Amino acid sequence: MIKSIDHIVLTAQDLEQTISFYCDVLGMQLEAFSPPDGSPERQALKFGNQKINLHDAQAPYIPHAKTPIPGSLDLCFLSEVSVEKWITVFAKHKIPIENGPVQKTGATGPLMSV
């Protein structure tokens, strides 16, 4: 049911140093994007059809990981089945949904997320 990774979220202690490493050393492209929920503009590191969204450990973006410490991350899978199907699967396995369904800005455009 999972076909690929869309993006991961990296919590960084020093955004400038993190951006420098990923862009200057690894050749990724810095990209700014505005989340569909109207929250402030954010930064991401784009490579191929994926991206790494950056969260500043000093000013965590909501929603964020339960314990957003520097070096922690979360990830977003792309699926060939609907969000509604995933809600059913999670309910069957008694897995609570922390956020969603909600529209997010994925690596290649808008997507629905839970």
What do these predicted regions represent?
Residues D6, L26, E41, G48-Q50, ...:
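A generic structural signal for short beta-strands and their flanking turns/coil linkers
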Residues H55, I62-S79:
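Helix-adjacent hinge/juxtasegments
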Residues I87-V114:
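Vicinal oxygen chelate
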Residues E41-Q43, L73, G109-V114:
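Short beta-strand micro-motifs in enzyme catalytic cores
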Residues T11-Q58:
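Core segments of cupin and vicinal oxygen chelate
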Residues Q17, S82-I87:
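Short, conserved charged micro-motifs
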Residues Q43-A44, H64-T67, T105:
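Short secondary-structure boundary/capping segments
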Residues M1-E16, L73-L75:
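N-terminal beta-strand motif that seeds the catalytic metal site of vicinal oxygen chelate
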